[in-house]
Amino acid sequence: MAQQAPDREKALELAMAQIDKNFGKGSVMRLGEEVRQPISVIPTGSISLDVALGIGGLPRGRVIEIYGPESSGKTTVALHAVANAQAAGGIAAFIDAEHALDPEYAKKLGVDTDSLLVSQPDTGEQALEIADMLVRSGALDIIVIDSVAALVPRAEIEGEMGDSHVGLQARLMSQALRKMTGALNNSGTTAIFINQLREKIGVMFGSPETTTGGKALKFYASVRLDVRRIETLKDGTDAVGNRTRVKVVKNKVSPPFKQAEFDILYGQGISREGSLIDMGVEHGFIRKSGSWFTYEGEQLGQGKENARKFLLENTDVANEIEKKIKEKLGIGAVVTAEADDVLPAPVDF
């Protein structure tokens, strides 16, 4: 016979008290007991991408996957997040499994290379073990692993060139993510995994593209960003950068499938001013008449490049435009949810 309601409630309270005693206060709780915790974020460096993410940046304490073709801007997006985390007083680490990090380029993007923790591991196991130990220290704000494809299992490195090592990397990633996910959440560390694209052979319908490292990362990632270069930016006949499109293909903290476009300039990274012009025009703060851009009666310049240079030189105007865009769209450094707010439910695909 089932227990009476008061007895069941008392038994549940005793069980919860024992769980708190054994595993620490807050190990189990009723979801409605407290106001929903604020989602703390790290800005990406592009206001359009911050808007597409729905919360104003990359969520802290979560796994992020950034993937795309070669030279599409994956590492640039990750380094901008590192620079913004450091600018807020945070500590950042970069696991350079590809052995391709350019410190001079990172410095131009705003990364404090003197305080950046860098590791160039020999094997995939070593890379993920180092990452796990750094995360468990509780001192990190952001860690970047570049890239998943370069996390070569020890058995493959020590074996012969023609040996078959089916599924080794996938098992390695699955085990590492099982260990790291809880530690990331507890420490509030954002882990960015940069990934490469491969093509599945014999696919007749649908996209043949897939990412390396098995399926575990797709499941554990709270946000997945698909980065693509869509056109080359030119100043006259000289190529000066790329127009980049990022699609949020998975988002557990806000509705997914939104897109953002921004400029990545060679040697400079994401053009903050270019994003402000695009978003300003879209939301009516900047007026575009022919090739002229105007803000509150003041001419910014003829052509986007001149307007961008004006905002670069007049940071107060750029900051004012950014503030207005963020206020209109309701995004910022921290998104809080009041008890009475009705928020769209996060969608997990």
UniProtKB/Swiss-Prot annotation:
Which keywords belong to this entry?
ATP-binding, Cytoplasm, DNA damage, DNA recombination, DNA repair, DNA-binding, Nucleotide-binding, SOS response
How is loss of this gene reflected in the phenotype of the organism? Not essential in the absence of DNA damage, its deletion renders cells much more sensitive to DNA damaging agents such as UV light, ionizing radiation, alkylating agents and DNA gyrase inhibitors and desiccation-induced DSBs. 5-fold decrease in survival, loss of HR, no change in NHEJ (non-homologous end-joining) or single-strand annealing DSB repair.
For molecular function, the Gene Ontology terms on record are: ATP binding; ATP hydrolysis activity; ATP-dependent DNA damage sensor activity; damaged DNA binding; single-stranded DNA binding
Oligomer status and interactors? Polymerizes non-specifically on ssDNA to form filaments. Interacts with and activates LexA leading to autocatalytic cleavage of LexA, which derepresses the SOS regulon and activates DNA repair.
Task: List the cysteine pairs that form cystine.
Answer: none
Q: Which HAMAP family match?
A: RecA
Which SMART domains does the record cross-reference, listed alphabetically? AAA (SM00382)
Tell me where in or outside the cell this protein is found.
Cytoplasm
Q: Which SUPFAM superfamilies match?
A: P-loop containing nucleoside triphosphate hydrolases (SSF52540), RecA protein, C-terminal domain (SSF54752)
Record: residues binding phosphate: 71-75, 196
The record ties this protein, via InterPro entries, to:
AAA+_ATPase, DNA_recomb/repair_RecA, DNA_recomb/repair_RecA_CS, P-loop_NTPase, RecA-like_C, RecA-like_N, RecA_ATP-bd, RecA_C_sf
The lineage's top-level taxon is Bacteria
What is the name attached to this protein's record? Answer: Protein RecA
What the protein does? Required for homologous recombination (HR) and the bypass of mutagenic DNA lesions (double strand breaks, DSB) by the SOS response. Can catalyze the hydrolysis of ATP in the presence of single-stranded DNA, the ATP-dependent uptake of single-stranded DNA by duplex DNA, and the ATP-dependent hybridization of homologous single-stranded DNAs. Numerous X-ray crystals have been resolved under different conditions which indicate the flexibility of the protein, essential to its function.
Q: Which family does it belong to?
A: Belongs to the RecA family.
| Keyword DNA damage appears in the UniProt entry | yes
Q: Which residues bind ATP?
A: 71-76, 102-105
A GO cellular-component term linked to this record = cytosol
- As given in the record, the signal peptide range reads none
Keyword Cell membrane attached: no
Tell me the Pfam families matching this sequence.
RecA, RecA_C
What's an example GO BP annotation here? DNA recombination
Taxonomic classification: Bacteria, Bacillati, Actinomycetota, Actinomycetes, Mycobacteriales
